[in-house]
Amino acid sequence: MSEMTPREIVHELDRHIIGQDKAKRAVAIALRNRWRRMQLPEELRVEVTPKNILMIGPTGVGKTEIARRLAKLANAPFIKVEATKFTEVGYVGKEVETIIRDLTDVAVKMTHQQAMSKVQFRAEELAEDRILDILLPPARDQWGQNEENDTDSSTRQSFRKKLREGKLDDKEIEMDIAAPQMGVEIMAPPGMEDMTNQLQGMFQNLAGNTSKKRKMKIKDAIKAATEEEAAKLVNQEELKEQAIFSVENNGIVFLDEIDKICKRGDSSGPDVSREGVQRDLLPLVEGSTVSTKHGMVKTDHILFVASGAFQMSKPSDLIPELQGRLPIRVELEALTSHDFKRILTEPKASLTEQYKALMATESVNIDFSEDGINKIADAAWQVNERTENIGARRLHTVMERLMEELSFDATDRSDELLIIDEAYVNERLDELVENEDLSRFIL
């Protein structure tokens, strides 16, 4: 779990996301509170519940990007789901409990990788011993016991040194390797994923763990043997317990597009993918126990971060019980022309840097002048104002249109230096930006 301070988290988010300081502060505090809670005594820790967050803001202002970056910083089980993918229990489709099951799968995978990295050094030593036993079979006495003398030991150490230096990598040997488990693909209708997983596990268990002799290069043999030895050193039952503990105490669920499951005033009758989903989410957010293939998972201390544009609805259209379970509200601001300029230049992997790198692969060097960047930002902002406001995503459309000709001709323009300035941008975008009808269909 991440031990970064709120200031460090915000600083890290600033490297990738422009503006939206309120939202960054809210998620930074929420993430730090996860760590603070784990420092409390057991009896008090149980009482401290997470303060779930609702992020409200127009499309393309950074809600989903904050979630993506948070997942990398959290170092905790994290899953991002679209609220629109679920239906009410009893109807065809995915039910909301699959969120927790998927989160548990993520935690098991994370815990497994961490455990494997801890035993990596020991596993490599055991793998080397297996390879050396094949290269230098130990001498046996008359009773079949292994004999070891000083000469054998020094020869073994000499071979071990060569093995580590990679001098034997291309030599071929034959060794026993666990046969890969047969993957059984079962097609099932939506909502039947649990049954599918159980059947797949049953078929894999029937196959059993078999090994077979394979001829391979020593370089590949060491890799395969290391994975096998590491798996033997890891206790799978302990892993599952650690993963469930991690989900229950550090798990984070990001619910995107929550505004799309608000009940609209003009609709009548049951709405199984809207209000029904909200009702099903209530016990998860409030705290309940979900059955997974790894064990029972309590959701009392899982942090939920919901987000939505709320263009066709408003937060008060959510059912009151769900509103109460999302106590922290953060409003994200619409992006201005100045924000667009910063988005094009400040982030670590900004759009301009991406296009420079892509063109450099064709030996075409491009550079963006300051007035060129200003013009691109203005063009994107103007199109947003005149047509639909899709936020920073408009920059992708404008940039792709601007670079289309160069991308097509790049192979014929090797070793050329091209400055993209205001005149270059005007030549390619002016007509589209000024003509509202063209903007609607092309940008």
Swiss-Prot record:
<dbReference type="InterPro" id="IPR050052">
    <property type="entry name" value="ATP-dep_Clp_protease_ClpX"/>
</dbReference>
<dbReference type="GO" id="GO:0051603">
    <property type="term" value="P:proteolysis involved in protein catabolic process"/>
</dbReference>
<feature type="binding site">
    <location>
        <position position="256"/>
    </location>
    <ligand>
        <name>ATP</name>
    </ligand>
</feature>
<feature type="binding site">
    <location>
        <position position="321"/>
    </location>
    <ligand>
        <name>ATP</name>
    </ligand>
</feature>
<dbReference type="InterPro" id="IPR003593">
    <property type="entry name" value="AAA+_ATPase"/>
</dbReference>
<dbReference type="GO" id="GO:0043335">
    <property type="term" value="P:protein unfolding"/>
</dbReference>
<comment type="function">
    <text>ATPase subunit of a proteasome-like degradation complex; this subunit has chaperone activity. The binding of ATP and its subsequent hydrolysis by HslU are essential for unfolding of protein substrates subsequently hydrolyzed by HslV. HslU recognizes the N-terminal part of its protein substrates and unfolds these before they are guided to HslV for hydrolysis.</text>
</comment>
<feature type="binding site">
    <location>
        <position position="18"/>
    </location>
    <ligand>
        <name>ATP</name>
    </ligand>
</feature>
<dbReference type="InterPro" id="IPR019489">
    <property type="entry name" value="Clp_ATPase_C"/>
</dbReference>
<dbReference type="GO" id="GO:0009376">
    <property type="term" value="C:HslUV protease complex"/>
</dbReference>
<feature type="binding site">
    <location>
        <begin position="60"/>
        <end position="65"/>
    </location>
    <ligand>
        <name>ATP</name>
    </ligand>
</feature>
<keyword id="KW-0547">Nucleotide-binding</keyword>
<dbReference type="InterPro" id="IPR027417">
    <property type="entry name" value="P-loop_NTPase"/>
</dbReference>
<dbReference type="Pfam" id="PF07724">
    <property type="entry name" value="AAA_2"/>
</dbReference>
<dbReference type="GO" id="GO:0005524">
    <property type="term" value="F:ATP binding"/>
</dbReference>
<keyword id="KW-0963">Cytoplasm</keyword>
<dbReference type="GO" id="GO:0036402">
    <property type="term" value="F:proteasome-activating activity"/>
</dbReference>
<dbReference type="GO" id="GO:0008233">
    <property type="term" value="F:peptidase activity"/>
</dbReference>
<comment type="subunit">
    <text>A double ring-shaped homohexamer of HslV is capped on each side by a ring-shaped HslU homohexamer. The assembly of the HslU/HslV complex is dependent on binding of ATP.</text>
</comment>
<feature type="binding site">
    <location>
        <position position="393"/>
    </location>
    <ligand>
        <name>ATP</name>
    </ligand>
</feature>
<dbReference type="Pfam" id="PF00004">
    <property type="entry name" value="AAA"/>
</dbReference>
<dbReference type="InterPro" id="IPR003959">
    <property type="entry name" value="ATPase_AAA_core"/>
</dbReference>
<protein>
    <recommendedName>
        <fullName>ATP-dependent protease ATPase subunit HslU</fullName>
    </recommendedName>
</protein>
<keyword id="KW-0067">ATP-binding</keyword>
<dbReference type="InterPro" id="IPR004491">
    <property type="entry name" value="HslU"/>
</dbReference>
<dbReference type="GO" id="GO:0016887">
    <property type="term" value="F:ATP hydrolysis activity"/>
</dbReference>
<keyword id="KW-0143">Chaperone</keyword>
<feature type="region of interest" description="Disordered">
    <location>
        <begin position="141"/>
        <end position="165"/>
    </location>
</feature>
<comment type="similarity">
    <text>Belongs to the ClpX chaperone family. HslU subfamily.</text>
</comment>
